[in-house]
Amino acid sequence: NGGSTLRSGYEHAGLEKNNGGSLTIADEDKNGKLTAWGGQQGAGIGGGSGKDGSNIFITGGGVNAIGGLAAAGIGGGLSGSGSNITISGGKVGATNGLNGAGIGGGQHGSGSNITISGGEVNAIGGKSGAGIGGGHTGDGSDIIISGGEVSASGGENGAGIGGGVYGKGEGITVSGNAQLKVRGGSVHGDYGTGAGIGGGGSYGTDGAEVEPDICALNPGGKIEYYAPRSSMSGTPNKTVTNPTGDFVWDSGTVTTPATCTGKGVRTYT
């Protein structure tokens, strides 16, 4: 209940959680707030310098995580990866000023096995980092957005969801009733823009867009793509929905999940 602020020193995370065990942030009374500032090279929530940030679960509350120089907002510190991060509720902001992902890897770190199933999430990558995924030169993979309202913005040259500068993005799934907004990072110097979903930019080349798996995206879910530097409250450049329509059943209840056999095609056996 109430509000708590954690502010760390050099090479340490605001709320430090390195490789061992797990960390759960919960708010049963729905009125708690946590702000965590990482010191230089430390994540807001996750790893200190040279450390990974893994097995982090946020189920509720107002959480604001600000990574220090070269570290993620939520995830790895400098040279650390962010993995097994799950957000299922709450209002979560995750930002970094330079070279780290909003949620995922610190500078030179990857972001993987990241799941968002609910809540309001705003992830902003630092310069050359992804909003959700890899930090500077890091890849972003196995990222699932299955619910909630999610906004992911890459820093300069970073993908909205996927890789940081020079990093790849792959294994990205958007499903359920997810409301997702993505924006790749802008050109910086001779380095190209980041993809909305996909890879980060590289020298003279824009990041490659990757088509996410939307087979299990419900008719109420959508992905909105915004241009670099554009306002994410305006009209998107592109909106993606699942071409599958609503299902009408004559009787009974579907108890076995569908198998996705193609874009917009679900098979029940």
What are these regions (language model features)?
Residues N1-V248:
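A composition-driven surface/loop motif
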Residues G234, T244-T269:
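Extracellular modular ligand-binding repeats in secreted and cell-surface proteins
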